[in-house]
Amino acid sequence: MSRVGKLPITIPKGVDVSLDEPLLTIKGPKGTLARRMPGDVEVHLEQGAVLIRRKDESNKSRSLHGLVRALVNNMVHGVSEGFVISLEIQGTGYRADAQNNVLNLSLGYSHPIQFVLPEGIKGAVDRNTIRLEGIDKELLGQTAARIRALRPAEPYKGKGIRYAGEHIHRKVGKTGSKK
């Protein structure tokens, strides 16, 4: 039995869960999320909780048990409270600016980069910090990873984009030649 999968997911007030096999729809104050459930697990709605159970003991259903529970839990958390990821920009001349759903990034290249945020993700810039908000944790994490990939922090001077609180392993540079 999966230690994660067997735990019930409590549904907070203001969140509505509906199951139309195989589509699970969760509505809350922040928005609506829907996801197709795999056929190897069963979703049960019981008095203020969602339970995920395996159909059989096959390797596939055992591996999906905890995954599906975590995905549904993230959906419930997203529509009730939402998720936030912060990115930090470090480097001389590196700047960011947010206009509507477009991030204008100046990252030391010969041209500015215009990054269009996907629907459902909001971005704000405060000095050298990019704050991304959304209800879909998967889409939010993928968007943050794509922004970070534009100029990842390099190990010598630490310039680039990093997650807030991320530790960059620093390296020492070359030493001068000995004559």
UniProtKB/Swiss-Prot annotation:
SUPFAM superfamilies: Ribosomal protein L6
GO biological process, one term: cytoplasmic translation
Cellular component, GO annotation: cytosolic large ribosomal subunit
Gene3D superfamilies in the record: Ribosomal protein L6, alpha-beta domain
Pfam families xrefs: Ribosomal_L6
Gene Ontology terms, MF aspect: rRNA binding; structural constituent of ribosome
Record keywords: Ribonucleoprotein, Ribosomal protein, RNA-binding, rRNA-binding
Record's keyword annotation contains rRNA-binding: yes
Domain of life: Bacteria
Function as written in the Swiss-Prot or TrEMBL entry: This protein binds to the 23S rRNA, and is important in its secondary structure. It is located near the subunit interface in the base of the L7/L12 stalk, and near the tRNA binding site of the peptidyltransferase center.
Subunit structure and binding partners: Part of the 50S ribosomal subunit.
Family as reported in the entry's similarity comment: Belongs to the universal ribosomal protein uL6 family.
Protein name in the entry: Large ribosomal subunit protein uL6
Organism of this sequence: Syntrophobacter fumaroxidans (strain DSM 10017 / MPOB)
